[in-house]
Amino acid sequence: MTTPLTRPADFEAFWQQRKQELAQVDPEFKMIRSDRSTDQMDVYLVEMQSYGRVKIRGWYTVPTHNAPHPAILSLPGYTSTMWPSVDRTNAATLALNPRGHGNSKDDVDPQDQEFMFIGFDPENPQLYIYAGVFMDCLRAVDFLSSRPEIDASRIGVEGASQGGGLALATAALDSRVIFCAADIPWLGDWIGYLEAEFWGWNNYPKLFALHPDLTFAGINQFLSYFDTMNMAEWIRCPVLMSVGLQDDVCPPRTAFSVYNALATDKSFVVYPFTGHSVTREHEKFKDEWMAKKLGVETLGQIYPSER
């Protein structure tokens, strides 16, 4: 099943411009050591300036031994909050809260507004919330690459749901990433998503109320800039994806559309009876896969059933 790409004519130029604008912003990285630190792991609250000079934060956990370390950028689900990941004792982790998420609401606070409506302006896609969120992820890679205790040649990215889509976008837009693990991903094949999922039919009227002159074609054209299916062929690192065939939040067809557009080393794990969730068994499988890509025997993760 191959889904036709929906790239606008200026798609590549659009993203090159966003990256250039990000590069012009001084990141002003700041780190504050947290009392969550242990003998094995240092935990830091990190802060940085991103696209549009928006302040974002995350939690950086790094082993206290055997530097330099490989690193994993962990990305959040839709409007969720990321917290420190202290169990991976053989790799550093940056759990990022992009703009509008968790502790990154100084400059972008959705409050009662639907997050994905922020900056929805058909004439100015560069102002859309996901233009900034995608760049926030690249800024996080900048942070990891800047750290002397990190081996910048061993940085991977992971996430689930929205985080899975963000992981794919990060791998597409930043060649420093050496693997991408995307579970039950969102943000791909927007047309398929809006046709198959209740969100579209519930929210199209709200978009038309905000933009009375908008058309279905206009919505699809706008969202095509932020479609990971259209970015997939830019990914050069290995990709692990998973999907649950009973998922009624991120329709499986959209994940297949992205996967089939990939032109790199790729693996897809399909769970026939699961929905919009990631099983503990898959988490363990993914951690083993990521450890291998990072060149370590194990990430050191201890699962609840093993405590």
Language-model features: where?
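Cap/lid segment of the alpha/beta-hydrolase catalytic domain
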Residues: 83-85, 92-135, 192-195, 199-201
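Acidic catalytic loop of the alpha/beta-hydrolase fold
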Residues: 245-250, 276-277
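N-terminal targeting or regulatory segments adjacent to alpha/beta-hydrolase or S9 domains
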Residues: 1-42, 299-307
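Short beta-strand/loop motif that positions the catalytic acidic residue
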Residues: 234-235, 241-243, 247
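Short beta-strand element of the alpha/beta-hydrolase
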Residues: 58-63, 67-78
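Gly/Ser-rich "nucleophile elbow"/oxyanion-hole loop immediately N-terminal to the catalytic nucleophile
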Residues: 118-161
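C-terminal catalytic histidine-bearing segment of alpha/beta-hydrolase fold enzymes
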Residues: 256-307
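Hydrolase active-site cap/lid region
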Residues: 168-214, 270, 278
